[in-house]
Amino acid sequence: MAEIENRPSNFIRTRIDQDLASGKHASTHTRFPPEPNGFLHIGHAKSICLNFGIAKDYNGLCNLRFDDTNPEKEDINYVNSIKEDVQWLGFNWDGEIKYSSNYFDILYDYAVELINKGLAYVCFLTADQAREYRGTLKEPGKNSPYRDTASDENLALFEKMRNGEFKEGECVLRAKIDMASSFMVLRDPIIYRVRFAHHHQTADKWCIYPMYDFTHCISDALEGITHSLCTLEFQDNRRLYDWVLDNISLECHPQQIEFSRLNLEYTIMSKRKLSDLVVNNHVEGWDDPRMPTIAGLRRRGYTPASIREFCLRIGVTKQENMVEMGMLEACIREDLNENAPRAMAVLDPVKIVIENYDADKVETLSVANHPNKEEMGRRDVPFTREIYIEREDFKEEANNKFKRLVLDKEVRLRGAYVIKAQRVEKDENGEITTIYCTYDPETLGKNPSDGRKVKGVIHWVSASEAITAEVRLYDRLFSVPNPAAADEFESTLNPDSLVILTNAKLEPSLANSAAEQGFQFERTGYFSRDSKAKNIVFNQTVGLRDSWSKTQ
C-alpha cells in the first residue's frame, strides 16, 4: 500500500483500507465508465478524481471504459472529447481503453446462460402493457404472459432477435426475478432490446443491444474491478448488479459503492438541460465558458490543478448537498494567484496626456511578472506621453477614501512614475475624453524625494503601444442558486452572464500569449486567452476576490 499521510479520508477509502487489510483484495482496481453521449462536466470530474485518485494513492489500476450500449445517442466525437478531458485533468488510464461493446459476444453468451437457467425470457408486451404490468411503488406488478415460456423456445426467440427477425419494440429479453419485489428495478427488468442502429465501434454487427444494468456489472467483473463506484441514483440498481453476477458463471464479483453526486450552485448538471441550452442558443456551444463542462471550464481559464483541488475539498460522502460556486472559484483564484503572471489591461479606457513628458519618447520599463516569484522573470513595458487608465480610476472630486486619481492630487502608476491630474477635457455630452497630467521624473521605482505621501496605485498602458482586444466578462449563468428546481429552468438564466468589451487596451506583451494561458490583469481579475477566437480575445476566469457573496 502507498503512504497514507496525504490521502483524503472518506467512507470509500475506509472500506478499501478494510478490504486490503483483511486480504479480501490484494490491490485496488477501479474504473471511470462514461457513456459517450455528451461532453463531460464538473460532476464527472468528481468521479474521475475519485477513481483515478484511488488508483494513484493505492498503487492500483484504473480503467477508462466507455459504456457504449446505446448507439443512437452516442458518437465517436464524444469518445474523443472524453479521452482528451481525462488526460487534460492529469490522469492516464491503465492499459488499453475499454469499451462495453468489446464484450458484446460475451454478454450475449451470459444472456443465453440465464435463459438456459430459466432466469430470462423473451417478452412481447408493448411498452404500455409492460408499464401496466410493472405495478407501482405501492402495488406489486403482475407476471408477463410470456414469463413461463420454455427455455428452448426463449433461446430460439433470442436468436431471432439477434438475427434481426423482429422489429424495434416488438420484443425484449427480460430477467426473471420477482414482479412483486419492493424494488422496482427487480421486477423483471429488460436486459436486451432490438435496435437497428449503426454503432461507432461494432458498426452493423449487432441489432440487439444489452441494457446498462446488465452490461455494467459484467464489464466490471470481466475487468477484475474491485470497487465499482457510482452515484447514489444507482443505489437500488446494486440489487440488480448483484443478482446478475450471482446468477452467471463469473467468479469475480465487484463491490458496488455509491456516493453523492455533485450539485453546484448557479448551474445545472443534466445532460438534457445542458443540451437544451446549446440547441436553444442560450450559450455558444458545449465549450461556452459559462458552461460547467470540462471544455467550458478549460476555455474559461480553469486549470486541471484547480479542478482537482475543488474535487478534493468537496470530499466524498453519501449526503446530497449543494456546493457553493464560491468554493470552485476560490480554488482557481488561489491557483492563479500563485502561478499566473501579471499583466496590465485597461478595460474601459480614458486617455491621459502627460504634458511634461517628451512627446516622442518611448521608455522601456522593466516590470516583474509576479510580485512574489523572482523566477518568473520580468517583462518590458513601454511608457509614453499618452497612456490609458480605467475610467473608474479618475474622479474630478472625491473624498480621502478614493485612493486613485483626482484633480490636483497624485497617484502612482504601477511600475512607473507618480502623476498629478491638472485638468480634463470633455465632449459635448460632458463625458471626459482626456485627462491632462504632469509626472515627477524622480519617482521611477521610488518615493518622492521631498517625503510627500502618495498612497494610491493604479494600472495603465501606453496609448501608442497598447494592443486593442476583446475582453469577455462572465457572471453566473443562472440567477438563482438551484435552477434545476425551477419549473422552467431556462427562465432563471442570468441575462447579464456575458458582457463583451471590444475596446480594451492591453500591454503589448499579451499579443504573444498562448491560447488558454492565464494572467492576472492587475487590479481587475484573472483572464485567459481564448482558444477559439482568431483575434486576440481574453475570457474572464474569476475576479480577484469573491464579490458575489457580499451582494447576496
Curated annotation (Swiss-Prot):
Source superkingdom: Bacteria
Cellular compartments per GO CC: cytosol
Keyword Magnesium: no
CDD domains recorded: GlnRS_core
Residues the record lists as binding L-glutamine: 67, 212
Motif interval(s): 'KMSKS' region: 268-272
Keyword flag Methyltransferase: no
Annotated EC: 6.1.1.18
Record-listed ATP binding positions: 35-37, 41-47, 231, 261-262, 269-271
Pfam families referenced in this protein's UniProt entry, alphabetically: tRNA-synt_1c (PF00749), tRNA-synt_1c_C (PF03950), tRNA-synt_1c_C2 (PF20974)
Keyword field: Aminoacyl-tRNA synthetase, ATP-binding, Cytoplasm, Ligase, Nucleotide-binding, Protein biosynthesis
Motif ('HIGH' region): 34-44
Catalytic activity: tRNA(Gln) + L-glutamine + ATP = L-glutaminyl-tRNA(Gln) + AMP + diphosphate
SUPFAM superfamilies tied to this protein: Nucleotidylyl transferase, Ribosomal protein L25-like
InterPro entries xref list: aa-tRNA-synth_I_CS (IPR001412), Gln-tRNA-synth (IPR004514), Gln/Glu-tRNA_Ligase (IPR050132), Gln_tRNA_ligase_bac (IPR022861), Glu/Gln-tRNA-synth (IPR000924), Glu/Gln-tRNA-synth_Ib_cat-dom (IPR020058), Glu/Gln-tRNA-synth_Ib_codon-bd (IPR020059), Glu_tRNA_lig_a-bdl (IPR020061)
Enzyme class: ligase
Major localization listed first in the record, in broad terms: cytoplasm
Example of a GO biological process term: glutaminyl-tRNA aminoacylation
Description of how the protein assembles with itself and partners: Monomer.
HAMAP family: Gln_tRNA_synth
Similarity annotation: Belongs to the class-I aminoacyl-tRNA synthetase family.
NCBIfam families hit by this protein: glnS, PRK14703.1
The name this protein goes by in its record: Glutamine--tRNA ligase
Species for this entry: Pseudoalteromonas translucida (strain TAC 125)
